[in-house]
Curated annotation (Swiss-Prot):
Keywords tagged on the record: ATP-binding, Chaperone, Cytoplasm, Nucleotide-binding
Top-level taxon of the source organism: Eukaryota
One Gene Ontology cellular component annotation held by this UniProt entry: chaperonin-containing T-complex
Gene3D superfamilies, sorted: GroEL, GroEL-like equatorial domain, TCP-1-like chaperonin intermediate domain
Any one GO molecular-function label of the UniProt entry: unfolded protein binding
Purpose of the protein: Molecular chaperone; assists the folding of proteins upon ATP hydrolysis. Known to play a role, in vitro, in the folding of actin and tubulin.
Listed Pfam families: Cpn60_TCP1
Biased amino acid composition, Polar residues: 1-13
NCBIfam families named among the record's database cross-references: chap_CCT_delta, thermosome_alpha, thermosome_beta
Oligomeric and partner information: Heterooligomeric complex of about 850 to 900 kDa that forms two stacked rings, 12 to 16 nm in diameter.
Main localization, broad class: cytoplasm
Name this protein carries in UniProt: T-complex protein 1 subunit delta
SUPFAM superfamilies, alphabetized: GroEL apical domain-like, GroEL equatorial domain-like, GroEL-intermediate domain like
Amino acid sequence: MVSQAKQPSNATFKNREKPQEVRKANIIAARAVADAIRTSLGPKGMDKMIKTSRGDIIISNDGHTILKQMAILHPVAKMLVEVSGAQDVEAGDGTTSVVIMTGALLGAAEKLLNKGIHPTIIAESFQRAAERSVEILLNMSTKISLDDKEALVRAASTSLSSKIVSQHSSFLAPLAVDCVLSIASHDSTNVDLNDIRLIKKVGGTIDDTEMVNGVVLTQNAVKTAGGPTRIEKARIGLIQFQISPPKPDTENNIVVNDYRQMDKILKEERAYLLNICKKIKKAKCNVLLIQKSILRDAVNDLALHFLSKLGIMVVRDIERDEVEFLSKSLGCKPISDVELFTEDRLGSADVVEEVESDGSNIVTITGVKTTNKNPTVSVVIRGANNMVLDETERSLHDALCVIRCLVKERALIAGGGAPEIEVSYRLMKEARTMEGVEAFVWQEYAEALEVIPTTLAENAGLNSLNVVTELRLRHENGESNSGISVRRSGTSNTYEDHILQPVLVSTSAIRLASECVKSILRIDDITFSR
């Protein structure tokens, strides 16, 4: 009897264990990241202290800031950092919520995988549940107008309530609203936050933070040659060339034999500098902003002497990345060569002066006359030390982003976990009318959304089981705005308690979390390239 030829083994394709193990490892890694920042959610959330590789200390409870600084090695865990970053760009707030939600949805997916449901079916059902969730959120939101300043301030206050600076929210929230409204028009659908410049100065307290309608420079006016420190009806020039004698190449040397030649060099130098200064004065410029130079002195003492004699105020060492903002704000064009220094390239302002505030000097440019449609504002942030300043800047940025969200999508919803419980209740109700696997998946998705109110209650020291059960009951009775009020240490109508957030924060978080989970579930192997 002829022995049968041995068939090639198909076991490699039948190995179902590996994809399951990979998925399990991915879910564990992602959930570990979510659990790490879970304690920093909400007004009673804790802060994290981070020591960077350079030895700097950061204290923050902003989800994106914490994750960005964490040394994360697992590639799937890095996806959560990117999701947090995407939420920061899209909405500016809710960066912690989106990561916690992703972790909870992955936990739900793990339960479903253990029941033997295919990952693609889970991912697609999650996506459909997310779309339905967004519809529910938009239906329960309340439309607002940009004229309703009180509603805007309340939304900004809710964002600030979880930060270190929460006790200053009564002062910082209106400041954030004023900043955004001063650069946004009624028909605008977006706000470029680059038009709001945040400047940090150590000294004073957070209450000394102020908004300046105009431009603030951290550099001081040059006083060494007795130049002016206040100019009215200013004509401002922004230059990128140097007002100092040109240097020879490194290989070349100049040999001077006698003093007459030395005299000639000095005379030449004086004539060269005087010629530049006269051209600047001829263009009717009386305030000169000089960009920092690496090659040689941006402006030397002799040039400063000539400029002060001509009554021109000089501010030097303007950073390269400030040039674009200054030219946009002041309406002046950067000038790269003295031959191009003409009157039409200058900007105009009512007053440019150096003022002393809380022990340090700043230069303020107010009453800017520009043809630019988009005005700009500056905010000088004050604080006791750099850590406080950095966290105040991050908190203020979050508040500005919340107002920007309301310019994009002019609708508010209740905060304190109310929208998540409402969406969870509605999805659960709809899941009961479905058939097959989809019903299972929607139920798990709905349950996972309850992680936000559960975490809020845990962080506030409440009994999360009792609180969430009570909230479910209230929502079943039609109280769709019932959420957790930390001030009352229990449940209440958070909309009436003025705990508000833009609808865009919640819709964006649900969309991004569901997309991230979909990506993670579709991965069945990790290979490392050479």
